[in-house]
Amino acid sequence: MTKTIAINAGSSSLKWQLYLMPEEKVLAKGLIERIGLKDSISTVKFDGRSEQQILDIENHIQAVKILLDDLIRFDIIKAYDEITGVGHRVVAGGEYFKESTVVEGDVLEKVEELSLLAPLHNPANAAGVRAFKELLPDITSVVVFDTSFHTSMPEKAYRYPLPTKYYTENKVRKYGAHGTSHQFVAGEAAKLLGRPLEDLKLITCHIGNGGSITAVKAGKSVDTSMGFTPLGGIMMGTRTGDIDPAIIPYLMQYTEDFNTPEDISRVLNRESGLLGVSANSSDMRDIEAAVAEGNHEASLAYEMYVDRIQKHIGQYLAVLNGADAIVFTAGVGENAESFRRDVISGISWFGCDVDDEKNVFGVTGDISTEAAKIRVLVIPTDEELVIARDVERLKK
């Protein structure tokens, strides 16, 4: 038995989960927030307890030190060296990383080079790797990429209709994201349906504040909604998803909001989506509450959100030539029952239908009616478990 920790490092946060492997038992999990700011918050959950402390954490190295010391303080481990492996979520692996990889040689430098593809994520992911490398230099460190699952896409799906030189010289293509989540729920869907994954055609919908939809055939991604960056695809909490690219030069010419690349990125990534249209919130719970109060902008935002998701599901039904199941996962997908009902009711012509009694808050499993030809499943994602499994597989 070994202890492996899965890490998801953000620019000012560090989410973690400690496993006993190969039993896949969660020993503890936690979140450190507001790294680099005053009044940082460290939360540790274990044995039904939740312990929280507020302190000033300057950087990721200090955050990791506090995490490890908390594990000892709460008697979850006796010493640092009980942890024999650490796995790090990394958003962008580009074309270079086609699978999870042990951190050695120039791997970390390559991760940082790929920050061009995920400027909001990869630098923070790399900071988490460096912090653990400094404090636990002898354990196996593994990087697990959101993009790896999508490297099976055919060229017709991942290429953009731009001049070829922008692909060959600049690597402009679709990379996708959330691959670890899509991979996990596809495997769980096969178990739930009692059929081999290799025999299934699935549409997996990872719908949280960020969202993506993937067409999965025989356990492999054949197309996905996110593109060159996690900005593409469906409408999201604060991101536009797909828009006409000509909008950008138009707004550069006629407004003061698009003067620099940073301005463009800020508006499209942080000020749009549900938040931008509703002028209210990026949180689906707030949107639904505002809809119930008759707020027009919130209602429009919700309708647009559902519409874009329905269109992508329909698109992937065409890509797959039908599907065995549509899978909902992540924060909104797992918990917003009215959202699931509304998405499926608009595409019921394809043979999918939701049973209202099964489609209740917090339910997992098959929520379809008996007569539905395409099953509708709700499966909680577990990206941390996939990361821990990959660490065990790659340990020296």
UniProtKB/Swiss-Prot annotation:
Its cofactor is Mg(2+); Mn(2+). SUPFAM superfamilies: Actin-like ATPase domain. ATP binds at residues 15, 206-210, 283-285, 331-335. One of its GO terms (biological process) is acetyl-CoA biosynthetic process. The active site is at residue 146. Keywords: ATP-binding, Cytoplasm, Kinase, Magnesium, Metal-binding, Nucleotide-binding, Transferase. It is found in: Cytoplasm. Mg(2+) binds at residues 8, 383. The record marks 178, 239 as: Transition state stabilizer. InterPro entries: Ac/propionate_kinase (IPR004372), Aliphatic_acid_kin_short-chain (IPR000890), Aliphatic_acid_kinase_CS (IPR023865), ATPase_NBD (IPR043129). GO terms for cellular component: cytoplasm. Substrate binds at residue 89. It catalyses: acetate + ATP = acetyl phosphate + ADP. Mg(2+). Can also accept Mn(2+). Pathway: Metabolic intermediate biosynthesis; acetyl-CoA biosynthesis; acetyl-CoA from acetate: step 1/2. It is an enzyme of class 2 (transferase). Signal peptide: none annotated. Its EC number is 2.7.2.1. One of its GO terms (molecular function) is acetate kinase activity. Pfam families: Acetate_kinase. Homodimer. Belongs to the acetokinase family. Catalyzes the formation of acetyl phosphate from acetate and ATP. Can also catalyze the reverse reaction. This is Acetate kinase.
